[in-house]
Amino acid sequence: IRYCLLSRGLGDVYKRQYKDYLSFNDFFTRKIEPQNRRIDMNKTSLISPCDARLSMYFIDEKSSFLIKNTRYTLKELLRDGELAKKYEGGYIGIFRLCVDDYHRFHFIDDGIKSHERHINGVFHTVNPIANDVYPIYKENTREYCVHRTENFGDVIVMEVGALLVGRIVNNMEKCRTKKGAEKGYFEYGGSTVVLIFKKNAIIPDEDILVNTVAGYETKVNMGEKIGTSVYIRSVSYTHLTLPTNSR
C-alpha cells in the first residue's frame, strides 16, 4: 500500500494515508479527494467514468473486442443479440483499470439507469502465462445496465470482473443519475469498465482513436473529457427495463 501511494506520487490524492488502511481491499476501494478529479460539466463533453487505460473502437456487425484476454462479439458480451444490433455503427470504450488505480466508477451524465443485468462467467487470471499453461473457460463475470442519458442517448454501462475481484458493487438499482456521481466500485482485483454508444451519439477525441489504431491505450482520469456529444434527443427518457438476469 505504501509503495502504491508514495512511489507513484499519490499520497495527497486520496482521503487517507497508507497507514490508515486496514487491509489491501480497504485500500483498493479507497475514495478520492474531490478536488483531485475535475469533472468536465459541459453538457456536450463525454467524460471518463473512471481512472483507466482507454481503448475506443467503432462497432460493426463483424466487430469483436478483446476484454481481459477474452475476445467477444457484442452479442456475446451482452448475451442479447437484439440489444447488440441496436448499437451497430456506434462506439465501444474499454477502460482497463490497474491495481493501483482508483477503483470507483461514476455516471457520465444526468439521466435514468435501468436495473443491473448480472451475467455469471468463470473467473480466470489475466496473466497470459497462466493462460498458456491451463485450459481456461474464457468468459468473465459482468454486470451491465442501460443508462438513458440526457446528452448521449441510451448508453450501455458494463463492469467486468476477473479472478481477483471479489465483487462488483453497484450502489443503486434503477434510479435517476447525476453526472459525476458515484455509480459503484470494484473490490480487490484488476477490473474493466465498458461503455457502449449507439450510432450518431458521440465523436471520440481524436488522440484516443489514433492511439487505439496504433495499438496503444490512452491514460484517462475520472471526469476527464474523452469525446463530444452529437446526439439529438427526440423523446424524453422515462420507462426503461432490461431482460431478467442470466445465471
Give the positions of each predicted feature.
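Single conserved hydrophobic/aromatic residue that forms the stacking wall/gate
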Residues: I1-Y14, Y237-R247
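Generic structural motif
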Residues: S48-L54, D109-I112, G180, A201-I202, ...
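Short hydrophobic beta/alpha edge segments that flank linear recognition/processing sites
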Residues: K178-V194, T218-R233
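Cytosolic, membrane-proximal regulatory domains of ion/volume homeostasis and mechanosensation machinery
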Residues: S64-Y102, H106-I108, E116-I168
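Extended, compositionally biased flexible segments
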Residues: R2, R8-L78, A84-K85
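Short, compositionally biased
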Residues: P128-V133, V193-E206, S236
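Short, well-ordered loop/turn sites that connect or cap secondary structure elements
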Residues: P49, I108, N171, T177, ...
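Acidic, glycine-rich catalytic/binding loops that coordinate metals and/or anionic ligands
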Residues: V146, A201-S236
